[in-house]
Design a protein with these regions (language model features):
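Short, small/polar-rich motifs associated with maturation and membrane association
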Residues: 1-353, 360-361, 365-373, 411, ...
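Extracellular/periplasmic, surface-exposed regions of secreted and cell-surface proteins
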Residues: 145, 190-191, 311-314, 348-350, ...
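C-terminal extracellular loops and terminal segments
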Residues: 154-158, 721-725, 767-794, 822, ...
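Conserved small-residue
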Residues: 252-298, 719, 736-830, 893, ...
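Acidic, glycine-rich flexible loop segments
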Residues: 284-298, 313-315, 384-422
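Extracytoplasmic gating/loop element in the C-terminal half of outer-membrane beta-barrel translocons
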Residues: 293, 304, 542, 583, ...
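Glycine-rich, aromatic-lined ligand/substrate-binding cores of catalytic
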Residues: 829-862
């Protein structure tokens, strides 16, 4: 191990001291700066063979829980030690030492241990040395985001792992879209599989405290994901949570407060200019008194000021861990409150976790883990549609007053948008409460040397209750709704693993039998025209009309898994995996089979590379495998009936039943075949590390829903139809630019190039599937599924500028001398070609600085907010965008982008290149500065102060509030992605944090 590696190890340990829970026993002023012999105090220093201090080494009195870790100078101090006690000193990468204390100071030198230098990586149903891996697995340690005010786990993945793309709705506690190497499915979920400590979570990442995470592994290629078979096609995120440590008591308290605001707004017309425009274009007069009040600011409304606010985020975390050589525990609790930057939007989380691990006998080990959370999210819907309050606010007249004399919220008389945006947010909001409980028990039996049996049994419980209320003070009628979703998933995994070595051969063989069952129950009730609004959504008994519904789903999965990993001389690695899944979701073809194979060659361990000192750790990897998706409802292959009303005779209405879905018993799995070719190597004595992967995925038997004409019975059915491909390159570069005792600088760059393409639909190259309308009655469908194009492709008109009258013009694609549906064409796509993340960590003495950049290039956004703000026709009926009036054709002539408002007959198309904007951006996602006061300074604990800023600046040409913002209708699919119709803006947040390690 060279000096650089040792220094890096020291810095790693320093970050653990500063960023993780650490307990150190009370400091004594009389002992500072020197080592004094004392009858019950054992002191000493731990160094490596070169005399460099080792920071963070574990020092323990053998057979007790009396322990500590070394400080910044490699020093330690233990109380209540008797002469003759055995002191055990250990540190990752070094051989442990046991020394009998004779009463004097200890000067301990640890020797390198080559056998443990390799990082251990958690993979499906096991763990493996990183050097032995043949597949593509990305590892994200909690140190990568330790000083960043992350409120949800998905934020930690954004930009930090190549091949992973994250889009956040921005709503506190709202939806997050995560894609691993692109979208594989057209109409079903593209979300990855989440596995926490070996248990699959249908509840996703809800209820997980980021502080509890030890590491995350992202399985990307088929060699890694095939072990999850029918649920691995979209990639797998493995999360390993924290546990207690033997001999080290750790108490941690962390508190942070953040202030958020909207840092970019639209330039809209003030009340005075709006009134002038109305008079000029519509001939609407205002009195002199009104115009005077608009001009001096005593009247009028700035709707952005009304709906946006300063949001406050509070986050408090407490953790305690301890343990002996045989039993360890970890307990944590978290309270988080996040006020959104839109009024009435808020998210709260109450969470607790406990973990107990014990070696009961020499051959039996048990681990028990529970995680419980209660979440409350308040606020309305910010999805695409004419009810989005942000979109409404940006189109509402600034000349109106907020409230009517009768106490109702006023509506805008100059457009046809029915509801007041402030009224919607205050009186038509809702509340969603979620209770998530996850628990597991592991039993590991060490049958004989190298042979272990582990049974992991877990539960994933979710109960979500949503309440909604609408007031007649805002709309035309009052209403309420209550909905409850209950889901319980049980999983039992039984794992037999053999690990053995002989001569230069190393073999690990795993066999797994697993059963999973899940049931979901739903119940809902709505009421309209309430007699009184006094009790909000607890009001169904006073509704003049009521409707109720309920539902039930159940499914089960039975699986068998085998995996063999072979290593010869640490040069040649071969991994083979096979999984068989039997799913109750399919009527006939219940069983699917998912094999994979991977090979790796570590060239740097070959004899002919011994004299090559310029390059280290060269490894070539290749893998191929098949994974699948069973992402359909449990009864999708069956013919389902539903009630419907019909007339019979002249004055009689009857209720009957008809086929809601047509049976498709031959429906089977989506299958994704993936090839991966990777190269890893290091330069300059491992100061510069590279990893690059080329991948190609092709999904066949895509699950699509097709419709049949009404004259032959109507309705829809599921089919296996279509093929989708994803190809690209993942790149990761880590540079340890500076590593010495005082200053360290590490820089990591992750990048992914991705090309998504629909290869085939059953109708041939001219077949296509329309997307959905983002706002029915105002905008037609904006996207299309078409062979040769990406999922999420925009289908619209090519804008060619303004004519001599100031009218918008478009390309006449079909040449019929008019602009109609035949002139639509592919005009862009929602998903980026290239994404990157760039992280820089700098440390100087007790100071730490972190800068994290996130970028996306090649994506388009359909800015329907700007379209309606610039339109004097349709639902908005009049402009609110300042440039649309002040820089229109009638004001500045031929250089204008916006048409003349005084010239009628304009053809303003919403889905066109005029409103389809370049969404490229480079953003300083986070900058944080921390200072650590060591315990010898404070006298009671290590104290770390952190100041950070999220979204400090964004470089972009996008004209909306946020180039990364989209209004999700469904975050699991990608067909209608990239539409901004009032996307919740990502705020700029300043956070101050305090962390104490006792």
């Amino acid at each position: 191990m060279n000096t650089l590696q040792k220094t890096a190890g020291a810095i790693l340990s320093l970050s653990l001291l500063c960023g993780m829970q650490v307990y150190a026993f009370p400091d004594y002023p009389s002992l500072r700066g020197q080592i004094i012999e004392q009858s019950d105090i054992c002191q000493g220093v731990v160094k490596d063979a070169n005399g460099e201090s080792i920071i963070g080494a574990s020092v323990l009195v053998k057979g007790t829980t009396n322990g500590s870790i070394t400080g910044l100078d490699g020093d330690f101090s233990l109380r209540n030690v008797k002469k003759g006690d055995i002191i055990v000193v250990s540190y990752v990468g070094y051989q442990s030492q046991e020394i009998a204390w004779t009463g004097g100071p200890l000067n301990i030198v640890l020797k390198e241990d080559a056998e443990v230098l390799d990082e251990v990586v958690v993979i499906g149903y096991g763990a493996v040395r990183k050097a032995d891996m043949a597949g593509s697995v990305a590892v994200l340690d909690n140190k990568n985001f330790k000083d960043q005010p992350i409120t949800q786990v998905a934020d930690a993945l954004q930009g930090r792992v190549s091949g992973v793309h994250v889009e956040n709705s921005g709503v506190p506690g709202g939806s997050v879209k995560i894609r691993i190497r692109g979208a594989n499915s057209i109409s079903k979920s593209n979300d990855p599989l989440y596995v926490v400590d070996g248990i699959v979570r249908e509840s996703g990442l809800d209820g997980i405290n980021p502080e509890d995470i030890r590491s995350m592994q992202v399985l990307k290629d088929a060699s890694s994901t095939a072990i999850y078979g029918s649920r691995g096609s979209n990639g797998v995120v493995l999360i390993t949570t924290k546990i207690g440590k033997a001999g080290v008591r750790e108490i941690m308290f962390d508190a942070s407060v953040g202030v958020s605001n909207v840092y970019k707004r639209y330039d809209i017309l003030g009340a005075y200019d709006y009134a002038l425009a109305l008079k000029e274009v519509k001939g609407i007069d205002f009195s002199n008194e009104e115009m005077q009040s608009y001009q001096n600011g005593t009247a009028g409304i700035d709707w952005q000021d009304e709906i946006f606010r300063t949001g406050i985020t509070q986050n408090y975390k407490l953790a305690l861990s301890n343990g002996s050589e045989k039993t360890q525990y970890y307990i944590s609790a978290n309270y988080m409150s996040q006020e959104g930057v839109v009024i009435e939007s808020k998210n709260e989380r109450y969470q607790a976790k406990a973990n107990l691990s014990s070696q009961l006998t020499d051959w039996l080990h048990i681990t028990a883990d529970i995680n419980a959370s209660h979440g409350v999210r308040r606020g309305g819907s910010f999805a695409s549609g004419k009810d989005n309050p942000i979109w409404i606010a940006l189109n509402y007249s600034p000349t109106m007053t907020m409230m009517a004399e009768n106490g109702n919220y006023n509506t805008d008389t100059y457009n046809s948008i029915a509801s007041n945006p402030v009224g919607i947010l205050k009186l038509q909001s809702g509340e969603t409460m979620t209770n998530v409980f996850n628990g597991r028990v592991d039993l590991r039996l060490d049958i004989m040397k190298g042979l272990t049996f582990t049974t992991t049994n877990g539960v994933d419980y979710y109960d979500g209750k949503s309440y909604s209320f609408s007031s007649k003070r805002v709309g035309t009628k009052s209403g309420m709704g209550n909905n409850d979703t209950y889901r319980l998933m049980l999983q039992s995994s039984n794992n037999l693993t053999y690990t053995g070595s002989w001569n230069d051969h190393h073999l690990t063989a795993t066999a797994v039998y697993e059963v999973t069952s899940s049931e979901t129950r739903t119940m809902g009730i709505t009421g309209n025209n309430l007699l009184t609004e006094g009790v909000g959504w607890w009001n169904v008994g006073m509704a003049s009309s009521r409707d109720a519904n309920n539902g039930y789903e159940q499914w089960a999965l039975m699986s068998g898994v085998t995996r063999v990993m072979y290593n010869y001389k640490d040069r040649y690695m071969l991994t083979g995996t096979f999984r068989a899944d039997g799913s109750s979701r399919f009527a006939k073809k219940k069983w699917g089979y998912f094999p994979s194979i991977a090979a790796a060659w570590t060239l740097s361990n070959e004899d002919f590379m011994k004299d090559v000192s310029s390059v280290q750790d060269i490894k070539l990897r290749a893998s191929y495998g098949i994974v699948g998706s069973q992402a359909i409802s449990p009864y999708a292959t069956m013919g389902l009936m539903s009630a419907t009303a019909y007339n019979f005779g002249t004055n009689s209405n009857f209720t009957g039943y008809w086929a809601n879905d047509i049976a498709t018993p031959e429906l089977t799995w989506e299958k994704t075949k993936q090839f991966d070719l990777g190269l890893e190597f290091s330069l300059f004595d491992r100061r510069l590390n590279f990893s690059v992967d080329y991948f190609y995925k092709r999904t066949t038997d895509a699950l699509l829903k097709r419709s049949i004409p009404g004259y032959v019975g109507g309705n829809s059915f599921w089919v296996n139809d279509g093929e989708i491909s994803n190809r690209g390159i993942d790149l990761s570069v880590t540079a340890r630019i500076m590593q010495n005792d005082r200053f360290q600088w590490t820089s990591t760059l992750n990048g992914t190039y991705l090309k998504n393409r629909v290869e085939r639909l059953s109708g041939g190259e001219n077949d296509f599937i329309n997307g959905s309308s983002p706002a029915a009655g105002m905008v037609d469908y904006a996207t299309i599924i078409k062979p040769g194009e990406a999922i999420g492709t925009f289908w619209g008109y090519e804008w060619t500028g303004l004519d001599e009258k100031g009218h918008d013009t478009y390309t006449d694609v079909d040449g019929n001398q008019m602009i109609d549906g035949g002139d639509r064409k592919v005009i862009g796509k929602a998903n980026p070609d290239f994404t990157l993340g760039w992280n820089n960590s700098l440390s100087y003495k007790n100071w730490d600085l972190n800068l994290f950049f996130n970028g996306s290039f090649g994506a388009k956004r359909l800015n329907l907010v700007r379209y309606t703000m610039a339109s004097a026709e349709g639902n908005s009926r009049f402009v609110t965008l300042a440039d649309a009036y002040l820089k229109g054709f009638d004001k500045i002539g031929s250089s204008a982008t916006y048409p003349s408002l005084t010239e009628g007959g304009n053809n303003l198309q919403p889905v066109s290149t005029k409103w389809l904007e370049n969404a490229d951006f480079l953003r300083l996602e986070n900058i944080s500065l921390s200072y650590t006061f060591p315990k010898k300074t404070t006298g009671f604990a290590d104290l770390r102060l952190t100041f950070s800023c999220q979204n400090l600046f964004t470089i972009t040409g996008y004209k909306g509030m946020d180039p990364a913002g989209t209004t999700f209708s469904n975050s699991s699919v990608d067909v209608d992605a990239g539409i901004d119709m009032g996307a919740y803006p990502s705020p700029r947040t300043f956070t101050f944090g305090l962390r104490m390690n006792f």
